Amino acid sequence: MTDLNIPHTHAHLVDAFQALGIRAGQALMLHASVKAVGAVMGGPNVILQALMDALTPDGTLMMYAGWQDIPDFIDSLPDALKAVYLEQHPPFDPATARAVRENSVLAEFLRTWPCVHRSANPEASMVAVGRQAALLTANHALDYGYGVESPLAKLVAIEGYVLMLGAPLDTITLLHHAEYLAKMRHKNVVRYPCPILRDGRKVWVTVEDYDTGDPHDDYSFEQIARDYVAQGGGTRGKVGDADAYLFAAQDLTRFAVQWLESRFGDSASYG
């Protein structure tokens, strides 16, 4: 039978998700590499459907979407070109704005899934489907989109999980929430203009956040994740052809905050 090169099936994926520890009713944030999973009978959307079936209708699936076309660079443009952007660039519309391509095609698939909910922070936007999707995505502040009351904070509060499905460990978005919480020296604050819809009209607002695009020179998310795994955190398995990790969001966040503060906190020694 192995000579037939049968693609991974829906049933096989459901079994693999359950073997990893995914259970009915969980709230789960997914990071995924479709390429790493391998060929799937029916296409990549079957991965999402299999995961939702493992979670059951009582569960919730969330992914980072962001905004593919966010014009956060316009302050660096020549004045004449910036003026064109200010006049012509469309606003962020949660119903239509595309998910960031680099973060997996599955994020765009989930964005267009029936009954999807999407949070209103353009750069830190999350999409979610399931019982707690509305709770996770509601009232997402424009400033400090990975902080208090963000979808990530809510995922931690409801004791949700993070699934890394063939995705690199340096892409765990939840660790931005840990960075927000950690009392560290020299957090870099950035401000950028962003067009949003307000009462049906485009308005430009200034968004303030910690700089998530310029990671600290002295650490990486992958290093935090591997240290967490080394001390027994999470579970590891195989889904399709992909290496997969399942992390409890609350425990991973607690570990990451302690990890960051012990090295870069106010009381940490300078090395």
From Swiss-Prot:
Reported impact of Y64F: No effect in catalytic activity with gentamicin as substrate
Binding site for CoA: H31, A32, S33, V34, K35, S104, V105, F109, T171, T173
Gene Ontology MF terms in the entry: aminoglycoside 3-N-acetyltransferase activity; coenzyme A binding; identical protein binding; protein homodimerization activity
SUPFAM superfamilies: TTHA0583/YokD-like
Record-listed E.C. numbers: 2.3.1.81
Amino-acid positions noted as binding a 2-deoxystreptamine antibiotic in the UniProt annotation, renumbered to this chain: Y64, D72, E102, E123, Y146, D170, H176, T212, G213, F221
Keywords: Acyltransferase, Antibiotic resistance, Transferase
Function: Resistance to antibiotics containing the 2-deoxy-streptamine ring including dibekacin, gentamicin, kanamycin, sisomicin, tobramycin and neomycin, but not to amikacin or netilmicin. Acetylates a broad range of both 4,5- and 4,6-disubstituted aminoglycosides, including neomycin, paromomycin, ribostamycin, sisomicin, gentamicin, tobramycin and kanamycin, with no preference of one disubstitution over the other. Acetylates sisomicin and kanamycin most and least efficiently, respectively. Does not modify plazomicin.
Family to which the UniProt record says this protein belongs: Belongs to the antibiotic N-acetyltransferase family.
PANTHER family in alphabetical order: AMINOGLYCOSIDE N3-ACETYLTRANSFERASE, SPBETA PROPHAGE-DERIVED AMINOGLYCOSIDE N(3')-ACETYLTRANSFERASE-LIKE PROTEIN YOKD
Subunit structure: Homodimer.
Record-given protein name: Aminoglycoside N(3)-acetyltransferase III
Species, as recorded: Pseudomonas aeruginosa
